[in-house]
Structures are given as C-alpha cells and as structure tokens.
Swiss-Prot record:
Topology versus the membrane: Peripheral membrane protein
Tagged with keyword Zinc-finger: no
Annotated protein name in UniProt: NADH-quinone oxidoreductase subunit D
Organism: Bartonella quintana (strain Toulouse)
Subunit architecture: NDH-1 is composed of 14 different subunits. Subunits NuoB, C, D, E, F, and G constitute the peripheral sector of the complex.
GO MF, one annotated term: quinone binding
Length: 396
C-alpha cells in the first residue's frame, strides 16, 4: 500500500470568535483534530496605556487603570494608589481601608462569576451565564451607588477613597451576602457534578508546579497547581491581615480544579465582605475615609466655603497635582486574575517618569501553547476559558 503523507494545516481562531474572550487571534497548527502548536497573536487592543499615564498627573492617571481588566476595575486602581501612597508615605484611615477591601472583594466576585459561567457556556451550558449575570447586576448597582459609575469607577484615590459610603448601602451589601451564597450553591449543584462539564474539563490543560513558576503564573493558575500563594496572606496589604479567610488550592492543576478554586474563592470573598460590613457598621462606623493630608487629598466642599487655604489646595491639586519624592516602587495586589503589579518611577515631578503595569493575564496567555499541545481542538476553548484573560490588561 502506498505511503500517504498527511500535512498539518493551520487555522485561525478569532479575533471574532465568541470564545476568544476579546480580540485574541490564535493560529493553531492541527494534525487532524489534535493541536500541535498554538501561536497567540496579541496587540489588537493596544492603546499605549503606560505611555499615556506618563503624560498625566497622578490623579488624572487613575481612570486608565479601570480600562485594563474592566471586569473588576477597582482591583487595578488599588495597586496604583498603593504605589503612590508608598512613594508619599501616606497612611490610609482604617475606614478607608475597609471600604477598599470590601470593593476589591466585590470585584473578585464580579470576575469569578463571569469566568465560571462563561467557561460553562464555552463547553455548551447556556443556563449558568443567565444566573451569573443576575448576581453581577446586583453588585454593579453597589458600584454605581458608591461612585456613580457601573464600570469605570475612579473610586480609589491616593490617600483613601473618593467619598464615604452611605449607611444604607453598607446594610444592603450585608443583606446581599446570604442570598448570593444560596444562588452560588444552586450554580454549584448545576455545574460541578455535571458529567459533560467534567468530561470537558478534567485532565485538560494540566501544568506542573515547576512549569507554573517558570512561566510566571500567579493567582488561581498557581493555586490550581497546588501552591497556596495568595498575596493577601503572603504579603498582606491594607487590612487583609485582620481578615479571616482560607486559600483554596487544587491538586490536579487542570481546568476543573481552576473552576473549583474560583467557586470557593467567591465564598471566601463573601466571608471577607461580611467582616468588612460588620466593622463598617460597628467599630469603624465613624471616621475619615481618606488621609487628612491636604497636600495629597482634596478638601471637602464645606471646608472650601469657609477657608481660602482649602480653596487654594483644591485648585492646585486639580490643576498641577501633587509632587512625589524621587524614587521607585513596586506594589502588587492579588487581583482576581493573579498578581497585578505596578512599577512606578518618580523623578520628583507631578507626573510619573515611568509606569510599568504587570498584567497577570499576559503571563498566563503565553503558556497557551504549552497547555494546549496534544489536546483536541475543542479543548482549546476550555483551556482559554480556564486561564481567564481579558484583553484590556493583556494588550494595555
């Protein structure tokens, strides 16, 4: 019988594909239906964020952070304002810290709800996204009530937060937690034991601990490999060291483990939210939400009506902005997708000399070739869904 040479063929996945989670183009080299090589092409959403931030004052640069991982915008702001505060040596009052932690955890739930439900949709389940978006809508309303915006918040500011929360909002967030946990249990019962969901995710996209470290994994991706690495515990910032919560870790390092970790992290986030709400309504009911250093934080309207000095401070802060001492600083936070870092170099002026943003999704996407090789074409969407990428932060 004559020998037949079968040549591998290339296909384009995206950038219009709904499972590409944004404007990702992947060139897949296939042997039949088995993936031999994956070549991700990025840059289709590049907007030059880092360079734009270097042309703005520190206060004007904050909104750019919302447009990176736009699924959980406040978590990105958090890293940037912490970096500025580290340069300035500014302390945030306890009530301000609690509000920041509360909204960071709301952001984590917003992110994980979207991810686990769209991951289920990527493998054929159409009900979970409808349930997930119902809960996300409630959380988005909390965002809106806190700062007036559903998505691009611009709420975290150097020195604290833009404004205090009304007591009714804090109470409503507290009332949200128990119904949310019931809804999460329903989602868990629907998806987790599902035979088809398991077949599509178990033993797919496996990576060892050593490979995960080498590739710069963080967040859910490294915890899925069995490493209890969470910056909220290992390098606590704000008041996370005062919070009680557990770090879920996986043992098989596959897509299914990563899904399970995200489900458990939502429960832990709800636990942290409850602690924040209790303290904001109890021991920390009153007090400032921002630093009282008027060289960094603008004065209140009431002060400006009676004090010329306050009016001058306000004018200077919104025109020229504050100056930071020369130096460099790196601050990382445990964002929902992994370690989001901001490397800031100051030359003593009112603008950053250099801003480098460390996006976790960028490192995770690079491993797409390693994770997918040898799997079927259909598994590529499951793996892509489990690594949780958003192109706002990958392309910056």
């Amino acid at each position: 019988m004559a020998e037949v040479n079968v040549r591998n063929f290339n296909i384009n996945f995206g950038p219009q594909h709904p499972a590409a989670h944004g404007v990702l183009r992947m060139v897949l080299e296939l042997d039949g239906e088995v993936v031999e090589r994956v070549d991700p092409h990025i840059g289709l959403l590049h907007r030059g964020t880092e360079k734009l931030m270097e042309t703005k004052t520190y206060l004007q640069a904050v909104p750019y952070l919302d447009r990176l991982d736009y699924v959980a915008p406040m978590n990105q702001e958090h890293a940037f304002v912490l970096a500025i505060e580290k340069l300035l040596g500014v302390e945030v009052p306890k009530r301000g810290q609690l509000i920041r932690v509360l909204f960071s955890e709301i952001g984590r739930i917003l992110n994980h709800l979207l991810n686990v439900t769209t991951q289920a949709m990527d493998v054929g389940a159409l009900t979970p996204p409808l349930w997930g978006f119902e809960q996300r809508e409630r959380l988005m309303i909390f965002y809106e009530r806190a700062c007036g915006a559903r998505l691009h918040a611009n709420y975290f500011r150097p020195g604290g937060v833009h404004q205090d929360l009304p007591e009714s909002l804090i109470e409503d967030i507290g009332h949200f937690i128990d119904p949310f946990l019931i809804s999460l249990s329903r989602l868990d019962a629907l998806v987790t034991p599902n035979r088809i969901f398991k077949q599509r995710n178990v033993d797919i996209g496996v990576i060892s601990i050593d490979e995960a470290w080498v590739r710069g994994f963080s967040g859910v991706m490294i915890r899925g490999a069995g490493v209890p690495w969470d910056l909220r515990k290992s390098q606590p910032y704000e008041c996370y060291d005062e919070m009680e919560f557990d770090i879920p870790v996986g043992k098989n390092s596959d897509c299914y483990d990563r899904y399970l970790i995200r489900m458990e992290e939502m429960r832990q986030s709800a636990r942290i939210m409850r602690q924040c709400v209790d303290r904001l309504l109890g021991s920390e009911k009153n007090g400032p939400v921002s630093s009282l250093n008027r060289k960094v934080v603008p004065p209140k309207r009431s002060e400006m009506k009676s004090s010329m000095e306050a009016l001058i401070h306000h004018f200077k802060l919104y025109t020229e902005g504050f100056h930071t001492p020369p130096g460099e600083v790196y601050v990382a936070v445990e964002a929902p997708k992994g370690e989001f870092g901001v490397y800031l170099i100051s030359d003593g002026t009112n603008k950053p000399y250099r801003v480098k943003l460390r996006a976790p999704g960028f490192a995770h996407l690079q491993a797409m070739d390693f994770l997918t090789r040898g799997h079927m074409l259909a598994d590529a969407t499951a793996i892509l869904g489990s690594i949780d990428i958003v192109f706002g932060e990958v392309d910056r």
